[in-house]
UniProtKB/Swiss-Prot annotation:
This is Toxin b subunit alpha. Expressed by the venom gland. Keywords: Ion channel impairing toxin, Neurotoxin, Secreted, Toxin, Voltage-gated sodium channel impairing toxin. Toxin b is a heterodimer composed of toxin alpha and toxin beta. Signal peptide: none annotated. The keyword Secreted applies. It is found in: Secreted. It comes from the Eukaryota. Disulfide bonds: none annotated. The keyword Cell cycle does not apply. GO terms for molecular function: sodium channel regulator activity; toxin activity. GO terms for cellular component: extracellular region.
Length: 26
């Protein structure tokens, strides 16, 4: 979900709309 602030991880996963519950970990 691209509504989250883009860090190096969710910049990729976030805009894919994948489950980011485990993506935000380092």
């Amino acid at each position: 979900d691209d509504l989250h602030p883009f860090n190096e991880n969710n910049m990729y996963y976030g805009c894919k709309g994948l489950s980011n519950s485990n993506k935000f970990e380092d």
